[in-house]
């Protein structure tokens, strides 16, 4: 009978630590993921919602469900638990599913560059990236300060005269080749590099060897000796003070050629003549005196 019926009220758990699960990183062509949240205690209920990005939730009331149609980038889902009249009745937690693009280009730091003082800056030309992949510039040699170390086309300031080498590192999550690196070298030439001077001409005897006296060059400028006339073997063609051997008697002419990159000054060439005299040449003899009768 109705006299034996007792009304009942649902009992909700007093507390709960509701968790939307661990963040995930995936790579195309996959566009699906499994959501795994903590299960609320009945009669509490849970519901999934899309916060940002894209995704179709198969069962938005199930803590463990499938989401399809993820987009490349960051996709955020929220697990909301309704715990009735308890303290903190509505609690939420979010999970982020980051989808990386398998077709993201491998790292390319761009072409090497030649720059001349007084400039100490240039614009880098790294390969573009497809987010959420990230790219980062770093200094391998020389100096440089990046305006934005994560921009492929950033400006780098504070270059030093000489060789400055930078790495462009691209990180692409869990995809194949997740980390690729390429390097670029920026050569900064000194606009104050001296005008080429091959040194003073030399007159020698009883030797076939001498030391050349070319003007010094400031790296990365390059100087090179070449034989223009006569004979001779230059021991180190790029040393302004190289030894030259094997010269023959007569005139031996050498050029000191300096290349100073894109600078207007400091490039060119100069010549030096090394004359080798023969120690065995006959002494002067004008012949016998002669008398002539008018």
Which residues does each PLM region occupy?
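Proline-enriched interdomain boundary motifs that mark the N-terminal boundary
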Residues: 14-22, 103-111, 192-200, 280-287
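Short, solvent-exposed loop/linker segments at the N-terminal edge
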Residues: 24-31, 113-120, 202-208, 290-294
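A short beta-strand segment in extracellular, disulfide-stabilized domains
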Residues: 30-40, 119-130, 153, 208-218, ...
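Solvent-exposed loop segments of extracellular immunoglobulin-like
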Residues: 41-48, 130-139, 218-226
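Solvent-exposed segments in extracellular or luminal domains encompassing
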Residues: 62-76, 152-165, 238-253
